[in-house]
Amino acid sequence: MLTETDERHLRRAIALAGTARAAGDGPFGSLLVAADGRVLAEEVNTERTDDDITAHPELKLARWAARRLAADEAGRATMYTSCQPCGMCATAIERSGLGRVVYALSTEQLAGLRPADAAPPVAYAGPALFDEARAAVEPS
């Protein structure tokens, strides 16, 4: 269940998405909010502007948090975002230690609204060469 505060911040994320869209970028916006309600940072999608397919607002905020927030502060922070984070962004969010994400549109809802933006399927093969791979990653 979302609080009124959650809804207010989520509306800001949606407004940021509109800003990105108006600039010709993907319609995605996000903000990071501290446990005390302070807005720590805001970002918009800049994939076209920066000619960078990884210029997602969620990824930029996860990087920001990893560099600037103590682990306990990150764990109490909330990211508000206009759409459910993609796999790349979700991994960065988890690795940054952020404790909570609130999003407006789900991945499925977004795909229904913007089918042309769906990523093409990729063929993955693996796991393979377990012993060799294990030797590369196992602690000495």
Map each language-model feature to its residues.
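Short beta-strand scaffold segments in enzyme catalytic cores
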Residues: F28-G37
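Residue-level structural signal for beta-strand termini and adjacent loop
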Residues: V44-N45
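A short, polar/charged loop-to-alpha-helix boundary motif
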Residues: T49-L59, W64
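Immediate flanking context of iron-sulfur cluster ligation sites
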Residues: A71-C83
